[in-house]
Each structure stands twice: as C-alpha cells, then as structure tokens.
Amino acid sequence: MNATTAPLPYSAARLHELAQLLIGNIRELAQAGWTPATSSNFSHRLDEQHAAITVSGRDKGRLVEEDIMVVDFDGQPVGRPLRPSAETLLHTQLYRRFPEIGCVLHTHSPVQTIASRLYAGSGVIRLEGYELLKAFEGNTTHETAVDVPVFANTQDMQVLAAQVEALLDKQSMWGYLIEGHGLYAWGRNMAEARRHLEAFEFLLHCELELLKLRSPR
C-alpha cells in the first residue's frame, strides 16, 4: 500500500504562474549583465505564509521551472528539499514585515557593486534632485532626497537582517546596497520592483559619472 502524499500547503498553480513570471524577468536581467557567475537571487510572494524564490547556485540566464522553490517566511524550504539562496532571510523579512510587498530582486551589476565599495565608508548614498526619483513609489517630485543605505557585507544573514530591520524602523526604503556585493530592491509586484531596481541602477550610474567629472585631472 502506497503512503498517502500530503497535500502541498500552497497553490501549485500559483507557483507555476510565478515561476514563469520570475524566469522571464530574471532572464532579461541576466542578459543585461546584472547576474554574473550564478549570483543574484529573486523572489515573489506566493501567499500569506510562503514565497517563491530561486534555488541557490543556478545560472540565472538559464533558469527552468524546477529552479524556483518555495520557502516559508522563516526561510525554510517547503515542498521540495532544495537549498534556497543563502540570503533568503533578507527576502522573507520584507514579506513578513510588509504585507504589501510582493516581490524582492537582488542583482550584482558592476555599477551597483562599484557604488557599494565607494560609499561603504559613509554608509549611505544620497540621491537628490533627479527627475527619476519619481520612479520610487510615493515620490511625486524631484525636489527630494532618497538615502540608499550601504551595509557592510557579512556571511551572517541574521546579523545583516537585524541591521536592515533596525533601519526600516527609522526611514522609508525602496532598496539598499551591500558593500562589494550588490543591490536589493522591492515593490508591491514584479513591475514595481523592476522599476525601483532600474531607477537605482540609473541613478547610481549618474552618481558614479558625476564623481569622475568632479575629480581633478
């Protein structure tokens, strides 16, 4: 007699839908050169207790549906015994804290990585006066400033998650950098998260170009 298979605690149909959404968008980001050497990780809220997230160590430009797994908001695998990204807690803490957040994107473009190294000492990059600041949800004017935190890199995700949590208590954030690493950005859905990600990429690139122009020759 075969053992009865326990039902999944989430919708398989919804997971399939989100896997296709993630794979298509991640492939475009990989083609842009933002996910080198299997780096980066991506997730989407699945329901009130689970998220769909990329499996660790997979080439982000060649993902298939089996490369998208499910975790609970404690970062534990659900359904299949696969290994999620080492940084899963940085995703799930956002879903746990903000019910409105539906998607979290983490990339490693050269611009993001270089900016994170240059501004690590100050711990923040101030973006001010740019028209594209209106790309961030809730911003309606260029006459404002957005502070992008730069956290020190660490392999201890509990420590980093606690640092992020402490800053979330103090300020509005659409994303942050990790030193020598890359950028996290999020939104209510994939479209908004990508808009925030692309806005950060553009604005950080502008800041790096301004630094070069202002440097004495």
Curated annotation (Swiss-Prot):
A GO CC term attached to the entry: cytoplasm
Textual note on the cofactor: Binds 1 zinc ion per subunit.
Assigned keywords, A-Z: Amino-acid biosynthesis, Lyase, Metal-binding, Methionine biosynthesis, Zinc
Q: In which pathway does it act?
A: Amino-acid biosynthesis; L-methionine biosynthesis via salvage pathway; L-methionine from S-methyl-5-thio-alpha-D-ribose 1-phosphate: step 2/6
Q: Which reaction does it catalyse?
A: 5-(methylsulfanyl)-D-ribulose 1-phosphate = 5-methylsulfanyl-2,3-dioxopentyl phosphate + H2O
The membrane spanning regions, by residue number, are none
Q: What does this protein do?
A: Catalyzes the dehydration of methylthioribulose-1-phosphate (MTRu-1-P) into 2,3-diketo-5-methylthiopentyl-1-phosphate (DK-MTP-1-P).
> What family is this protein classified in?
Belongs to the aldolase class II family. MtnB subfamily.
Quote the protein name from its UniProt record: Methylthioribulose-1-phosphate dehydratase
Organism, as annotated: Xanthomonas campestris pv. campestris (strain ATCC 33913 / DSM 3586 / NCPPB 528 / LMG 568 / P 25)
> Which gene holds the coding sequence for this protein?
mtnB
